[in-house]
């Protein structure tokens, strides 16, 4: 693990950091029994960067302790509020027939959006996500029954669109009809485990319905999402060390809370 911390691949060194933080926390009272290990840790932290990274990992691990509270808030407050306002949003006059230069944003939409309380809920969800909170646990908890998740190691497998299970089930390609979904899967919004769940779920949705779901996005949304600079920004965000370590912690959390074999292991959370 200590060798892996210095690996050039960010996926490797960040995962190693997470595991080191967990091991040091669980076995902190035994560290003094291994002076050579203490020496190695001191050498790694000569410039202070190792300690700063560990501190960041510990904060992320502490934040994961709030997942149940956030999950409850999502299920009981935020999601119901969003569902309650679906009909309002659908029946609202968006003003597409108006000259876009005269009115870029429909005031009726903004007023109803704020008065419904939906705006506050969405902002709250966005703030939680920006802080690194696990806001998707409740959404994906019911999507872990696929055969893929029967193997414990698959819960921690870095997401790969060329994984045999993806190709066999979905035939996902980075171009063509799946381009939008591919871009979403390359972003840092979801942890690896949830990306696999999303793929398997989409694979079982008829093509017509899948197209209808994607068609819900306006042409402007699609253009923005496919914009080269913005799509590049999404990919860069996904490669940030703090995003990778946080996603790995979310993967671990899902395994210890949702896996059918979770009772065979000590719950580190």
Where are these regions (language model features)?
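HEAT/HEAT-like alpha-solenoid repeats
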Residues: 2-6, 42
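Alpha-helical repeat scaffolds
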Residues: 31-45, 73-79
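Alpha-solenoid helical-repeat scaffolds
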Residues: 157-269
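Extended alpha-helical scaffolding regions
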Residues: 71-143
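Residue-level detector of extended alpha-helical repeat arrays and alpha-solenoid scaffolds
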Residues: 13-14
């Amino acid at each position: 693990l200590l060798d892996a911390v210095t690996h050039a691949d960010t996926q490797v060194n960040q995962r190693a950091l997470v595991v080191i933080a967990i091991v040091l926390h669980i076995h902190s009272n035994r560290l003094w029994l291994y002076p050579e290990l203490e020496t190695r840790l001191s050498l790694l932290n000569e410039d202070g960067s190792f300690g700063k990274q560990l501190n960041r990992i510990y904060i992320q691990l502490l934040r994961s302790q709030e997942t149940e509270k956030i999950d409850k808030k999502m299920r009981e407050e935020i999601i119901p509020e969003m569902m309650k306002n679906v009909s309002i949003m659908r029946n609202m006059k968006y003003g597409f027939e108006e000259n876009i230069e005269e009115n870029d944003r429909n005031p009726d939409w903004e007023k109803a959006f704020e008065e419904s309380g939906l705006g506050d809920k969405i902002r709250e969800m966005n703030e939680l996500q920006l802080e690194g909170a696990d806001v998707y646990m409740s959404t994906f908890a019911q999507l872990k029954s696929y055969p893929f998740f029967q193997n414990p190691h698959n819960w921690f497998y870095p997401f790969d669109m060329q994984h045999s299970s993806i190709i066999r089930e979905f035939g996902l390609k980075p171009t063509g009809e799946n381009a939008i979904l591919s871009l979403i899967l390359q972003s840092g919004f979801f942890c690896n485990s949830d990306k696999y769940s999303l793929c398997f779920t989409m694979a079982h949705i008829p093509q017509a319905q899948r197209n209808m779901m994607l068609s819900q996005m306006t042409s402007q949304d699609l253009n923005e999402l496919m914009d080269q600079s913005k799509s590049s920004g999404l990919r860069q965000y996904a490669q940030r060390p703090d995003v990778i370590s946080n996603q790995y912690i979310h993967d671990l959390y899902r395994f210890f809370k949702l896996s059918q074999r979770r009772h065979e292991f000590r719950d580190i959370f």
